[in-house]
């Protein structure tokens, strides 16, 4: 029996971009940046396998997709920002306070020897349960040629800290976790633009097993779908499904890890079983990026991000974070939060202001600044590129409804606990000049 829930056309018709309870705050054009030498976007906090943000020896730690600026004068920032995915790597930051004002850039997380493909895309950084300092970076190994390749993968290392900061060792190799199989989700043979990325790995409290949710597409040839009554939902009388709806085929996939594999640190392909998607958006949208779960008050909240530009069939919705809730465990059924699925969208006057929202177990939401309108008399369409973290906001979760409740500092994070480890400072390794060149 299928456990897949649907985000329907009727659900999406309920989206209200003018609702202040589901709208991100406006971003000032004079926003601060974290570091002028790098540009960052998708970001996540160091967490445990249960989804809680944790500190390590008193330090807050986050990872970010990043590129080094080529021109520090910002003369070419538009081109550099718009092509950033072609140079993306995973970097990290550390802070004593987590208040957003004192993030220190730590540099590259994975060694280049770990790269199975040229680009490192989004995922999750997770402390290994029952270890002192082992940490797994689940991420997307991506290449555009000779065909679109996007494979959830993992690299493992160790975290260290002293009075002055945080550093990592290891992360020298990567292991592929699973690939789009054309059965549970579309692969490159079915859809040359297929999405298969952003692994979020966690332990389900209900059965104690380790799962990964990820972005995918409904299996089948691109554009060759029939949008039937199940995909339409309870549409109003006379409503006609718009042209191109069959090109919206997003799915939130799920895979389960074999028992005992997590404890052994074995995340190889043979240890994962891909299951039917948790949610599909056939006829609605073609992207459900960075899916992640929150277990709260006996419910399972499933969040994802999407773009205005990936809606299909004439449907309209903002760039932002969307969500679904289940009262009956991880496998649902799920219903869209706020009836429509929209949790937080950009203000209509700043439609591209923020993106890649991530919701933590206490409802704090981090995102990055994308494009902020900054019109001048000479150029009314001028804008400022962000490439830094947006103000953190908080949402209240009340059953199947959400409400924007608080706005915090730029780049602020909140830990739900401290990783259980000897607080004594670690001894820094002595790195020779030749070793540093190899690492770089």
Place the predicted regions along the sequence by residue.
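Carbohydrate-active catalytic/glycan-binding domains of CAZyme proteins
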Residues: 1-440
